């Protein structure tokens, strides 16, 4: 009885060894084709981090998608490609110098009362005054500009802020490339329905998102 038992045990051991060998041979090619998770992570983080940071900083309202459809083309094309190169510079009587900016002796701002789209206004500031649409970085400058436009028969004026990017990677930028470190939004802004460009309200000085194809007065810095 011992001999059949020994033969059965020996046969079982050989079968188990053979099965293990076949399993190892089958798994090896599959493992070679599959990248380890820790090798995928760095590249994924580099691609996803900017969007993730923006998701934490900004949440957008339900109207933002409609706004992107309406004037998204304005955001993706540079100013020289968008406007009429024959656009004439404003007459002197249509401009007002903004003076008395506290704490900034070299700051020069100009209110242009002629009505233009955001892109036209941006181009006019660059071409006619060798400047840019104004960027605002503190309350004092915002207040002084608001005082200079309060007498206008218009509810808003263009400043140099706009939305760039798409989806959850959208963010606000100044067209002159300076840092976005100050904002003075009106109630429920910037999350409520609006456009991709930023306008300053002539009463109160608060900011609102506006559709870029609207024609408004504007402020140049030069």
From Swiss-Prot:
Pfam families: Lectin_C. Residues 1-16 form the signal peptide. Residues 104-222 form the C-type lectin domain. Residues 37-60 have a biased composition (Acidic residues). Detected in plasma and urine (at protein level). Detected in placenta (at protein level). High levels of the proform in placenta and pregnancy serum; in placenta, localized to X cells of septa and anchoring villi. Lower levels in a variety of other tissues including kidney, myometrium, endometrium, ovaries, breast, prostate, bone marrow and colon. Nitrated. Residues 25-75 are annotated as: Disordered. GO terms for molecular function: carbohydrate binding; extracellular matrix structural constituent conferring compression resistance; heparin binding. It comes from the Eukaryota. Residues 17-105 form a propeptide. GO terms for biological process: defense response to bacterium; defense response to nematode; immune response; negative regulation of interleukin-10 production; negative regulation of macrophage cytokine production; positive regulation of interleukin-4 production. Disulfide bonds join 125-220, 197-212. InterPro entries: C-type_lectin-like (IPR001304), C-type_lectin-like/link_sf (IPR016186), C-type_lectin/snaclec_domain (IPR050111), C-type_lectin_CS (IPR018378), CTDL_fold (IPR016187), EMBP_CTLD (IPR033816), Eosinophil_major_basic (IPR002352). GO terms for cellular component: collagen-containing extracellular matrix; extracellular exosome; extracellular region; ficolin-1-rich granule lumen; transport vesicle. Glycans are attached at residues 23-25, 34, 62, 86. Keywords: Antibiotic, Antimicrobial, Cytoplasmic vesicle, Disulfide bond, Glycoprotein, Heparin-binding, Immunity, Lectin, Nitration, Proteoglycan, Secreted, Signal. Binds heparin. Does not bind calcium. Cytotoxin and helminthotoxin. Also induces non-cytolytic histamine release from human basophils. Involved in antiparasitic defense mechanisms and immune hypersensitivity reactions. The proform acts as a proteinase inhibitor, reducing the activity of PAPPA. In pregnancy serum, the proform exists as a disulfide-linked 2:2 heterotetramer with PAPPA, as a disulfide-linked 2:2 heterotetramer with AGT, and as a complex (probably a 2:2:2 heterohexamer) with AGT and C3dg. This is Bone marrow proteoglycan. It comes from Homo sapiens (Human). The lineage of its organism: Eukaryota, Metazoa, Chordata, Craniata, Vertebrata. The gene is PRG2.
């Amino acid at each position: 009885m011992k001999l059949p038992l020994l033969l059965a045990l020996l046969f079982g051991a050989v079968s188990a060894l053979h099965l293990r060998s076949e399993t190892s041979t089958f798994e090896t090619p599959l493992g070679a084709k599959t990248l380890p998770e820790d090798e995928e992570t760095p590249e994924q983080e580099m691609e996803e981090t900017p969007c993730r940071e923006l998701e934490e900083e900004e949440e957008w309202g339900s109207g933002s998608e409609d706004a992107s459809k309406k004037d998204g083309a304005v955001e993706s094309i540079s100013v020289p490609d968008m406007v009429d190169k024959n656009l004439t510079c404003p007459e002197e009587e249509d401009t007002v110098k903004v003076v008395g900016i506290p704490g900034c002796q070299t700051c020069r701002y100009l209110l242009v009362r002629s009505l233009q789209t955001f892109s036209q206004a941006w181009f006019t500031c660059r071409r006619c005054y060798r400047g840019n649409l104004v960027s605002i970085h503190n309350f004092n400058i915002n207040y002084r500009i608001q005082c200079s436009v309060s007498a206008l028969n218009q509810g808003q004026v263009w400043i140099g802020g706009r939305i760039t990017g798409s989806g959850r990677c959208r963010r606000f930028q100044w067209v002159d490339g300076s840092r976005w470190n100050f904002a003075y939004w009106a109630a429920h802004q910037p999350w409520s329905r609006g456009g991709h460009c930023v306008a300053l309200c002539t009463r109160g000085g608060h900011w609102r998102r506006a559709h870029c194809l609207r024609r408004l007065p504007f402020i140049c810095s030069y």
